[in-house]
Amino acid sequence: MNGKRPAEPGSDRAGKKVKKEVMAKFSDAVTEETLKKQVAEAWSRRTPFRHEAIVMDMDPFLHCVIPNFIQSQNFLEGLQKELLNLDFHEKYNDLYKFQQSDDLKKRREPHICALRKILFEHFRSWISDISKIDLESTIDMSCAKYEFSDALLCHDDELEGRRIAFILYLVPPWDASLGGTLDLFSVDEHFQPKQIVKSLIPSWNTLVFFEVSPVSFHQVSEVLSEEKSRLSISGWFHGPSLTRPPTYFEPLIARSPHIPQDHEILYDWINPTYLDMEYQAQIQEEFEESSEILLKEFLQPEKFAEVCEALERGRVEWSSRGPPNKRFYEKAEESQLPDILRDCMALFRSEAMFLLLSNFTGLKLHFLAPSEDEPEDKKERDAVSAAENTEEGTSHSSSEPENSWAATSDSSLQSEGPTDPEEDEAKKESSVPTCQGELRHWKTGHYTLIHDNSKTEFALDLLLYCGCEGWEPEYGGFTSYIAKGEDEELLTVNPENNSLALVYRDRETLKFVKHINHRSLEQKKSFPNRTGFWDFSFVYYE
């Protein structure tokens, strides 16, 4: 149906011929009264409902699929053309990589205007009727374009006022082999995402919508096609916010002081260049200038070769680390490690290594380390730490093991009510340097994310990489450091064989490992038996 857009009063276009207003309707089958009542009843009872015009499912959370959402193919083609003519901007951070248009709220293109009217007037009214949610007229929609290696990782969409999320797909013929599926996650007893239990394949003119809630965890899987683009319009209908369950805090990973170990272990393992005191002084000078350094060929060649051989033999028992809204990678089970790998872990926990790192960085990681300016620095850090810990009950404090304060499972840190300031100060003064570490396996699909509860503190990060010959930055897998509240990277640490990366971070710095995409499979051309790379990851605390 077509009509004319009336000229605005006072406009110089008045009296002149103007473009016809584009009109479109969504599926009559959805608005048919009997069907509408059935859908509303299914929503109310939280029971599945299937019809050729709409499918509603409750597993793992309430979501609906409407095929043939728009009646006119001509309208859809016109809409697609307008969308592809928009300016797209790359969206890139720890959570996603894709291209997005500007907000479509004020676009004047006729087909975009018509779709906006359909969605935020007629369709919003229909959803309000079936869901009994008082949805607002707030317009919140944009266009997204996912191409090869683009993805949006696990998240729940929860933001103040978002009640219903929707996606309208305008894709060429598509199947699961192309990636780009909308993956839905189940949750565990703590309302944390557990695993993918359903994947919806994009389809031309299909609209998916779901209820935004504390359990609506989903992702857009990586697009695997190098020829096709996944084009969609997505947004949210806003309304009264739901009450969130209490924030879940993960159990803290215990930190441990150094293991008593003779300094001879350093001569057995480490490149002699790095044991020269004059060279250590140069390293410290550079580190104190930039708070980071990369020490190449760190381990002796024979030892490094033994470590790599043990990793490539595949005799390590790995366990997956989650939940997927925070991280996804594999961690070695230390009790089952081959001797050479167990010895390497012991090296990084050794007293000799704590002292060596003190010499590299100037940090007080050993009682023998120089501490000329300790009083000012230590008091400042302790003061900040104390202030942060008193705010834990009201702020988004961390459930991230790497970024949490407790050094051990000291029950007094979790006791209720105020504590004795003098007792607290005594504990701080008597505290000893500690560390925590793991051996990790990184391969296609792995990542870590910054999350709402990320908490930071002063710490020294150590990374030693293995098996990453020929690894390219475009594959992902690099460690990125950013300032709180910012997307701009402060530092990127790329995987480099037998290189030791040291990074000192403060309370305003967050880190993540970028999602490893399918470009990384290029590695198999040179190393057919290798999947990804490994790193020894340790964090040291003064």
UniProtKB/Swiss-Prot annotation:
Co-factor remark: Binds 1 Fe(2+) ion per subunit.
Where does the record place the region Disordered? Answer: 371-435
**EC number(s)?**
1.14.11.-
Q: Which domain of life is it from?
A: Eukaryota
Gene Ontology annotations for the cellular component aspect, listed alphabetically: cytoplasm; cytoplasmic stress granule; nucleus
- UniProt cofactor(s): Fe(2+); L-ascorbate
Q: Which PROSITE patterns match?
A: FE2OG_OXY (PS51471)
Q: Which SMART domains match?
A: P4Hc (SM00702)
Q: Where is the composition biased (Polar residues)?
A: 395-417
Q: Where does Fe cation bind?
A: 155, 157, 218
The chemistry this enzyme catalyses reads: [ribosomal protein uS12]-L-proline + 2-oxoglutarate + O2 = [ribosomal protein uS12]-(3S)-3-hydroxy-L-proline + succinate + CO2
Subunit and interaction comment: Monomer.
Q: What is the purpose of this protein?
A: Prolyl 3-hydroxylase that catalyzes 3-hydroxylation of 'Pro-62' of small ribosomal subunit uS12 (RPS23), thereby regulating protein translation termination efficiency. Involved in stress granule formation.
The name under which this protein is listed is: Prolyl 3-hydroxylase OGFOD1
List the source organism.
Bos taurus (Bovine)
Instruction: Tell me the name of the encoding gene.
Output: OGFOD1
